[in-house]
Amino acid sequence: KPMVVFGMGGHASFPVCIAAKTLGIPFIIYENNIQIGKSNKYLLPFACKIFTSYEELVGIKNKYDHKVVVTGNIIREEILNFKKKNQFTEDVLNILVLGGSQAAKSFGEILPGVFQECKKENVNIKIFQQCTESQNTKLNEAYKNLNFDFELFNFTNNISEYFSKAQLVITRSGSSVTAELINCKIPFISIPYPHATDSHQDKNATYFEKKGYSISVKETEVNKKLFSLIKSFYKDRKLLDRMIEQQKKHSDKEVFVRINKTIKKLLNE
């Protein structure tokens, strides 16, 4: 019989935590979005603690504030220990485009037009873009016609290799990838998925922008705003440096120390 159960949020951990409650086993839940998820919201009244990635947590009642422990993001050791190796030049801006299958498809459709504007305005960029296999040929032809350096990839087990190459990232505002970017001190433009449950990606993006970690652009405004942002970053790298300085104020290095300390204290009560 376990002494404590740790639920990482989402549908998978929900029945396990309910079983723990039924058996009288204390459990802890973890929320890595700014907006508490539905499963965690239901479980919170019965949980001993809720670990959070950031200081802000939307969607909980004040009476549960005492259960909140800000631990930071639970992320891979490879990312926790990430150190950027590449040296960058002022005459080119390296942009990494990240997204899962849905995001990759959307970005593959809307970004070529933005990058075409960069070419017209002599904004010298190099693109590393995650795309779906079905987009390989079309994007390859489009970017070759624009005559700038680019690399397309579908999936990688070594994302840190691409992080090392990036000065700016264009991504959705899901909790996992943004946590890794903040830890690696890489400025990013987040384009929230407009149909995310409880608009949690919008809330993540708003929080990150408020903190100065990133810039948020709604998908409906990409064609209007994204080129201007890229041009600004290309012309003035200090804008990127400011975001990096803000990201340095957030640290996940002690996340496992904080978690272990809280669990040990709980078990000794």
Where are these regions (language model features)?
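Acidic donor-binding loop of glycosyltransferase active sites
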Residues: P2-V4, S164-A179, I186-P187
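C-terminal alpha-helical cap of glycosyltransferases
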Residues: D252-E269
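Donor-nucleotide binding loops and adjacent catalytic segments primarily
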Residues: K83-V169, D202-A205, V217-L226
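C-terminal "capping" alpha-helix adjacent to the active site of nucleotide-linked donor transferases
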Residues: K211-G212, S216-K238
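A short, well-ordered alpha-helix in the C-terminal region of glycosyltransferases
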Residues: L239-K253
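Active-site-proximal region of nucleotide-activated glycan assembly enzymes
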Residues: K21-F82
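Short hydrophobic beta-strand element within catalytic cores of glycosyltransferases
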Residues: T171, P187-D198
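An aromatic- and histidine-rich active-site surface loop
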Residues: V4-L23
